[in-house]
């Protein structure tokens, strides 16, 4: 028997201003080269822009955008008998949120625009309304999973 104790699960920290875990997840994904203060600046500017654009609570817009982009199912490449199949798998809530944040940031980086705060705010507002590249990515993933439903038993 092992003498080691069980490791405690780490809880996701929340950001200092909004005390929100989603904002913290977003900050950690937008982070480049360890510049966390710059990441916070970008997020807070984006939140201000969302407030100006929609005149509603920006955190509810963020939650709605992430809920809209979060996938329920994804495809995973699995090698069976020499050929690779795209096998649909269900995704948990944490992994789904992480994917949604990654897609939102990827879509906002691709957008034409002035700065990252502007692009991120535009993408979040679009995602909350049900349009934008991140939503398209989710729908594409769901289509792939639906098309490869025949391989679901390879899990």
Curated annotation (Swiss-Prot):
- Give the keywords, sorted: Chloroplast, Plastid, Ribonucleoprotein, Ribosomal protein, RNA-binding, rRNA-binding
> Main location per UniProt?
plastid
Kindly give the Gene3D superfamilies that the UniProt entry links to this protein. Ribosomal protein S7 domain
According to its UniProt record, what is one Pfam family this protein matches? Ribosomal_S7
> From its record, what is one biological process in GO terms?
translation
The question of whether Translocase is a record keyword is answered with no
PROSITE patterns found in the cross-reference section: RIBOSOMAL_S7 (PS00052)
What the entry lists under NCBIfam families is as follows: rpsG_bact (TIGR01029)
Q: How does it assemble?
A: Part of the 30S ribosomal subunit.
Family per UniProt?
Belongs to the universal ribosomal protein uS7 family.
Q: What is this protein called?
A: Small ribosomal subunit protein uS7cz/uS7cy
Q: Record the organism.
A: Nymphaea alba
């Amino acid at each position: 028997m092992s003498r080691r104790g069980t490791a405690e699960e780490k809880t996701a920290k929340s950001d200092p201003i909004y005390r929100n875990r989603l904002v913290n997840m977003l900050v950690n994904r937008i982070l480049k080269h360890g510049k966390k203060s710059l990441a916070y600046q970008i997020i807070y500017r984006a939140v201000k822009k969302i407030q100006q654009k929609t005149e509603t609570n920006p955190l509810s817009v963020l939650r709605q955008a992430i809920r809209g982009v979060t996938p329920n199912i994804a495809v995973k490449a699995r090698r069976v008998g020499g050929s690779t199949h795209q096998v649909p798998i269900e995704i948990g809530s944490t992994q789904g949120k992480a994917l949604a944040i990654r897609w939102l940031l990827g879509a906002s980086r691709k957008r034409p625009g002035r700065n990252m705060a502007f692009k991120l705010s535009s993408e979040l507002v679009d995602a909350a309304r049900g349009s934008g590249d991140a939503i398209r990515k989710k729908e594409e993933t769901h289509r792939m999973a639906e098309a490869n439903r025949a391989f679901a038993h390879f899990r």
